[in-house]
Amino acid sequence: MKNYKKTYFDYTTKDFVSMVQEPGGKKLGNCLYCYKPLTESGVDFHTACNKRFFGQLYTPTLDYSFDDLEALASKVVSSHMAVTGVQPKLSLSLHRKQDKNRVKKLTIVGLYGDYILKPPTAHYKELPEVEDATLHMADVCGIAAVPHSLVKLTDGTRCYITKRIDRTRNGKLGMEDMCQLAERLTEDKYKGSHEQVAKLVLKYSSNPLFDVTNFWEQVLLSYFTGNADMHLKNFSLVENAMGTYSLSPAYDLVNTALVNPADT
């Protein structure tokens, strides 16, 4: 982890949002992926950032409004095809059966998509920006994190989007969170400890010393960014191409001190 000149982050939620938004709440002037200034008008991503995150030169369309997502999310949950977790999530995939010259669409597909979309909620309207900014801090610190970005709906609402790391062109990869490895029920995810997670990493990882070091870096980052929600399901071992398991990149990092100051 890189050295910090400051060891304490004293940010407000508005500070986090301002990292990806121009003053006054006007049109985004920075790339939703890398946060650097855009060089073209009418776009939300650099061409290189589109290629890096979506695998194509243009931003795929996401033809849903916030109200559309709320209605669709209810249908997905009732059909038992929702992505697991407390925060509302929708599974997306690029619609590839289109004319090669047309911009591809991101569509909701149930469980087996390539991306996970997290819209804001009524109680935590700026949660997508906070989660993406927290993971961006991991990137800046040199800590491996899942591919992530912000993306806009048709009504301008920003959502958090991440690329699934347990999916490849060849199929699904195994991914076991620490709740599963500790043989605990999901409702017991808060009944563990970082010491227990470290021991599980040492026991099951194919590269234990390297991975346990990376694990403690994630713990330190969580402390510095005010993240009080790193339970057993927020650390996982993921299968690689050789069939062995290693610590997954950081995911579900949220500055809970900003989102819910009472939970600190």
Model region roles, listed by residue range:
Residues 66-189:
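Conserved ATP-binding subdomain of kinase catalytic cores across diverse folds
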Residues 10, 153-154, 240:
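Acidic surface patches and DE-rich sequence motifs
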Residues 262-264:
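Short beta-alpha connecting loops at secondary-structure transitions
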